[in-house]
């Protein structure tokens, strides 16, 4: 029975490693990363372990077996390579956002542009409302002390702080920007987290273009009414959601 249990755990981790590997490749497929600028992780909460991309390894050279297994204390459990340098950020999100099953970090250009400007991505239409029920928050930049200290861990702490201060539930807004840095997204699994990174990039682009068009006519009357935002969010994600097919 002990052997069977170990084999089951091993099989589940191998499946998670494959998912995380494939999700990392999706970042390239969807144009969300260049070079090695990005990472995906996924967690098995029952086992208290998560899997993350190795640091600085080109996507073309990666294999599923290269994925690194970590525990929730930040210790490497399995893998020959070093984990992503952003691992402490992922870990802090897993520790604080109980329903998150996977985390993505990219430097996708549209989302990064808003982050570098220190701006929230405001909700201007129903495309955004289908994704989140509020503006995508841009968390504060890190202090010099935070940067010189445990930088990546403190990045995660700033994200958690931002959501707590604004009263935002991570399930209702699966994305955040870090001022002067870039975006993080999350989801129930690695593929959903990547999907959310792709949607964030699209709504970031739309928001910029909306502001540019509105500025031509000095039109400040842009934005989505709360009742319309609520309708679109709830019909897709709410208790009585009816978007899509019955499961």
Enumerate the language-model features and the residues they cover:
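Glycine-rich flexible loops
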Residues: 5-247
């Amino acid at each position: 029975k002990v052997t069977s249990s170990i084999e089951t755990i091993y099989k589940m981790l191998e499946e998670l490693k494959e998912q995380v590997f494939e999700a990392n490749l999706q970042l390239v497929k969807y144009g969300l990363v260049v070079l090695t600028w990005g990472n995906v992780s996924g967690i098995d909460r029952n086992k208290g372990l998560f899997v993350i991309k190795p640091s600085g390894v080109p996507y073309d050279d990666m294999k599923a077996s290269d994925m690194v297994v970590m525990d929730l204390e930040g210790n490497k459990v399995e893998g020959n390579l070093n984990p992503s340098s952003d691992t402490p950020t992922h870990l802090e999100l897993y520790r604080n956002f109980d329903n998150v099953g996977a985390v993505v970090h990219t430097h996708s250009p549209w989302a990064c542009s808003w982050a570098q400007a220190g701006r929230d991505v405001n909700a201007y239409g129903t495309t955004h409302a289908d994704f989140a029920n509020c503006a995508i928050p841009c968390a504060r930049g890190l202090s010099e002390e935070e940067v010189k200290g445990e930088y990546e861990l403190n990045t995660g702490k700033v994200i958690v702080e931002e959501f707590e201060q604004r009263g935002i539930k991570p399930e209702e807004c699966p994305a955040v920007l870090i001022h002067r840095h870039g975006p993080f997204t999350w989801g129930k699994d690695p593929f959903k987290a990547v999907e959310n990174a792709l949607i964030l990039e699209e709504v970031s682009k739309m928001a910029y273009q909306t502001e540019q068009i509105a500025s031509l006519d000095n039109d400040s009357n842009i934005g989505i009414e709360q009742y319309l935002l609520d309708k679109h969010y709830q019909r897709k994600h709410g208790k009585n959601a009816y978007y899509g097919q019955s499961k």
